[in-house]
């Protein structure tokens, strides 16, 4: 085990505070509509230009171990804000740095760190209650577009794309962001359920121009096992032929004789048929097949349920108005499932999302939920260069999470104003002792920093801007950094999702409280560089003069 260096008290906190300030100073320049870009060096490829606070924070690694510990703790604030709300990372970082800065002064003045932390926690509870009381539900498409535009640093086009996406797939639908191959940004919406499995054989293709299978008013057989022989299925296939309708087979695999027979029948025109592999693996596959069954009003054929293929009848098959299958994806539109059954399945998946502790499982469950409940919207972000596309994609990602958060918990005035108003509510907050009161005061001062920093980035005096906003008692009155005017921010569309602001405050105070109550720090001693042994002379080099 290598030797460690230990620092205590003021010495430890000072080094840690230096690291916090370095990270916060790099991140806070991106805040607000007039925030600047940060250029990140990459070990390969072109440098990355971004205004995304968490992307900047993740790049910072300091040489001094003690400074780096402080920086990494605040980086954690940005990461947690990004994970929980997808936005508000810069605000959370600015708040955390402000609380740590003020808290360190109070500890140095001899106050009890644990009482300070208790005061900070009391203040945060009051701030969260104030945000929830004053948040306004998002109802119109315009409000969603405004939230998206603000989060994308004032880009109205991105806001409009997001509002359209939410309108088309609903609040439960999945919105994914990809890089486009062209200059233009575009929105593509997939209605119905889509899963990432294509046709097993290209001989099933019905539209040769687009190389895809298109079937209208189709039956769907949902089978959990492999199909290698069609003997058990013959009665069912004959019944389907009698109806004159096409059949889509979803199974673990279709191979050998079964595949050959289906292809021959398809080519001869006796049976309109296509086969695709079932999506997912293991238990997830069973669940997804059950989803497809519920969506199409059919039954998943599984030996677990005691159903054998030879006993399957037409009324056990699913139905859909349209099925499209290309090389990579299968889309089922307008399944014949009962609305009540689909809603019950959606409620069941939502309950599983609440209970799961795995991020991966949660993501997969949300994908399943979206496929059942809404659909999938894909925003393809375009740009002139790769660097521009990546920077824009970062902003679209932020904006997408912000719009989701706004729909969940409503909106509050933007520009740091909601936090300024909440800070006024802390003035009369009752505490048990003076040190706790100082903890509340630390949060009260810190809450003005986001508004102050937005003004500074816009070239204004932060203190004057904060003073003018607080002089006006109207809740939504604030400073529009884009135009340099004071006005009602909500009516101008300058709004923040209440969830984003709440999570920024909670995460910032949580990590800052831990930093304030730190009394000792332990880090590895830097390794001393040792000179390696001299390189031996190569044979035949003796007597050479240079």
Swiss-Prot record:
Gene Ontology terms describing biological process: chaperone cofactor-dependent protein refolding; protein refolding; response to heat
GO MF assignments: ATP binding; ATP-dependent protein folding chaperone; isomerase activity; unfolded protein binding
Stimuli inducing this protein: By NifA.
Gene Ontology cellular component annotations, sorted alphabetically: GroEL-GroES complex
Keywords: ATP-binding, Chaperone, Cytoplasm, Isomerase, Nucleotide-binding
Stated name of the protein: Chaperonin GroEL 3
Subunit comment: Forms a cylinder of 14 subunits composed of two heptameric rings stacked back-to-back. Interacts with the co-chaperonin GroES.
Enzyme class: isomerase
Family from the record: Belongs to the chaperonin (HSP60) family.
Primary localization class, coarse: cytoplasm
Keyword Nucleotide-binding found: yes
Record-listed E.C. numbers: 5.6.1.7
Physiological role: Together with its co-chaperonin GroES, plays an essential role in assisting protein folding. The GroEL-GroES system forms a nano-cage that allows encapsulation of the non-native substrate proteins and provides a physical environment optimized to promote and accelerate protein folding.
Catalytic activity: ATP + H2O + a folded polypeptide = ADP + phosphate + an unfolded polypeptide
Superkingdom of origin organism: Bacteria
Entry binding sites for ATP: 30-33, 51, 87-91, 415, 496
InterPro entries, per the entry: Chaperonin_Cpn60_CS (IPR018370), Cpn60/GroEL (IPR001844), Cpn60/GroEL/TCP-1 (IPR002423), GroEL-like_apical_dom_sf (IPR027409), GROEL-like_equatorial_sf (IPR027413), TCP-1-like_intermed_sf (IPR027410)
Record's subcellular location: Cytoplasm
Native organism taxonomy: Bacteria, Pseudomonadati, Pseudomonadota, Alphaproteobacteria, Hyphomicrobiales
């Amino acid at each position: 085990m290598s030797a460690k260096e230990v620092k205590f008290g003021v010495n430890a906190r000072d080094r840690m505070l230096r690291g916090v300030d370095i990270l916060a100073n790099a991140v806070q320049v991106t805040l607000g509509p007039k925030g600047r870009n940060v250029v990140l060096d990459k070990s390969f490829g072109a440098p990355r230009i971004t205004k995304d606070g968490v992307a900047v924070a993740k790049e910072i690694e300091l040489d001094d171990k003690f400074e780096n510990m402080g920086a990494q703790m605040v980086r954690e604030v940005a990461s947690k804000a990004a994970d929980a709300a997808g936005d508000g990372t810069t605000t959370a970082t600015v708040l955390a740095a402000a609380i740590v800065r003020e808290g360190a002064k109070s500890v140095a003045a001899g106050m009890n760190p644990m009482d300070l932390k208790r005061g900070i926690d009391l203040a945060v509870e009051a701030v969260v209650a104030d945000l929830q009381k004053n948040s306004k539900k998002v109802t119109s498409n315009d409000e969603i577009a405004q939230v998206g535009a603000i989060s994308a640093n004032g880009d109205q086009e991105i806001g409009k794309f997001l509002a359209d996406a939410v309108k088309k797939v609903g609040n439960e639908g999945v919105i994914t962001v990809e890089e486009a191959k062209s200059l233009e940004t575009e929105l593509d919406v997939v209605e119905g359920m889509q899963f990432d499995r294509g046709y097993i054989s290209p001989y099933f293709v019905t539209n040769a121009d687009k190389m895809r299978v298109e079937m209208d008013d189709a039956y769907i057989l949902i089978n959990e096992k492999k199909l290698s022989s069609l003997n058990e299925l013959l009665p069912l296939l004959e019944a389907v032929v009698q109806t004159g309708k096409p059949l889509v087979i979803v199974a673990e695999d279709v191979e050998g004789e079964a595949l050959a027979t289906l292809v021959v029948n398809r080519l001869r025109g006796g049976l309109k048929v296509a086969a695709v592999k079932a999506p997912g693996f293991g238990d997830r596959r069973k669940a997804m097949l059950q989803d497809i069954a519920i969506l199409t009003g059919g039954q998943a054929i599984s030996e677990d349920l005691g159903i054998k293929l030879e006993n399957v009848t037409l009324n056990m098959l699913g139905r859909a108005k349209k099925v499209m299958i290309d090389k990579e994806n299968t889309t089922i539109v307008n399944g014949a499932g009962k609305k009540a059954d689909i809603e019950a399945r959606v409620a069941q998946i939502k309950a599983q999302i609440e209970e799961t502790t795995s991020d991966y499982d949660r993501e997969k469950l949300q994908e399943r939920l979206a496929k059942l409940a809404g659909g999938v919207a894909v925003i393809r972000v375009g740009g002139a260069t790769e660097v521009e596309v990546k920077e824009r994609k970062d902003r679209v990602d932020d904006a997408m999470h912000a719009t989701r958060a706004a729909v969940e918990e409503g909106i509050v005035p933007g520009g740091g104003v909601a936090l300024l108003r909440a800070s006024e509510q802390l003035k009369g907050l009752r505490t048990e002792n003076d040190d706790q009161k100082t903890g509340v005061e630390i949060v009260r001062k810190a809450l003005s920093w986001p508004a102050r920093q937005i003004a500074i980035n816009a070239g204004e005096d932060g203190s004057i801007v904060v003073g003018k906003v607080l002089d006006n008692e109207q809740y939504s009155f604030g400073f529009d950094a884009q135009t340099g005017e004071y006005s009602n921010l909500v009516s101008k569309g300058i709004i923040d999702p209440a969830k984003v602001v709440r999570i920024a405050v909670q995460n910032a105070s949580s990590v800052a409280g831990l930093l304030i109550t730190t009394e000792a720090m332990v880090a590895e001693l830097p390794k001393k560089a040792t000179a390696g042994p001299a390189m031996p002379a190569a044979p035949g080099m003796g007597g050479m003069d240079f």
